[in-house]
Amino acid sequence: MTLRYLTAGESHGPALVAIAEGFPAGLAVDFEAVDRDLRRRQKGYGRGGRMKIETDAAQFLAGLRGGLTTGAPIALAVWNKDHENWKDLVSPYARGGRKFTQVRPGHADLAGALKYGLDDARDVLERASARSTAVTVALGALAKALLSTLGVEVCSRVVAIGPREIRPDAPPTPAQRDAIEASDLHVDDEALAAEWRALIDAEKARGGSIGGAFDVYATGLPIGVGSHVHPDRRLDARLAGALCGVQAIRAVEIGDGTQVGRPGYEFHDAIHHDPARGFWRETNRAGGLEGGMTDGMPLRVRAYMKPIPTMLHPLATVDLATRAATQARYERSDVCAVPAAAVVGEAVVAWELANALLEKFGGDAVEDVRRAVEAYAARIR
């Protein structure tokens, strides 16, 4: 069986919950590593007041015993501390409070309210909120645990805030990863981070918001994960879909995908082989993916995040109830959440990679999967 999951919960409800199925038995789960990723998601220069309230941690309810997966479905919850301040407004048992009708451009408010026949966009924005990515990150941490067992590591780096973008072509080194994790902008260049902070400060001062981009990397993937056979099995399509499913992500680039103005001999990666290394490339312009499959080079995927639509200086809109012109309603929000989005990006990429590896190598016990990967790697050398 491959991986699947469902989540439920609202931004200010009691909890965000998930049920995940398909993890092989015997996988060791480091609970502190799960919570560490949740804390990483809360960090970042430009975040709003919500992050000062929440201290996210995952509570596992089923599917593990003694820190090991049992092969049964895994249930977990991330509790919302802020629910106490909103319980009269978002209670499952009663409806109260002012209706949210001043729908915000750039959000799900208007389309969701019209689609579901709602007179209060609160029911849309509570579920559409990026707060739901807390449980996504917890699920991604489980996928990372499986990937690590199979020799695959996933990390990320912010590469743009506003118009200031960089194009590193290789995964960060261990020292660079340490610097990235220590940075409030998730980057290993402090001079660049200072420029970005100034951009964020400027937007905050004028009541706006600012977007950017991040790269997600994966190392240790064998050649041939994914498939060329059907579009829905192509790993690049699955990764792009997973990243575009994250709130506010508007575009995805695989490798040097936007650099298509180059001639072919400057865009593709020549193939080499030697007995010790197997197949290898001098360059990685493809970002580790060719024909819908991994090519043995590090995976490199870039996601572009739009500016957060909720702004202190709002745009014009229409009131859902009266159809009269008005200003969009302000809800507590971030000025910039690109560093947090990078952590979410790691999670969804890790999930898709873990799923693709299980599709190829199967196994109800984690040791069976590991041995299958090792045997395959030896065969294709």
UniProtKB/Swiss-Prot annotation:
Keyword field contains Manganese: no
BP term (GO), one: aromatic amino acid family biosynthetic process
Keywords from the named record: Amino-acid biosynthesis, Aromatic amino acid biosynthesis, FAD, Flavoprotein, FMN, Lyase, NADP
EC number(s) from the headed UniProt entry: 4.2.3.5
PROSITE patterns documented for this protein: CHORISMATE_SYNTHASE_2, CHORISMATE_SYNTHASE_3
Catalytic reaction list: 5-O-(1-carboxyvinyl)-3-phosphoshikimate = chorismate + phosphate
Free-text comment on the cofactor: Reduced FMN (FMNH(2)).
Binding sites annotated in the UniProt record for NADP(+): 41, 47
Gene3D superfamilies: Chorismate synthase AroC
Cofactor requirements of the protein: FMNH2
Subunit structure: Homotetramer.
Record-given protein name: Chorismate synthase
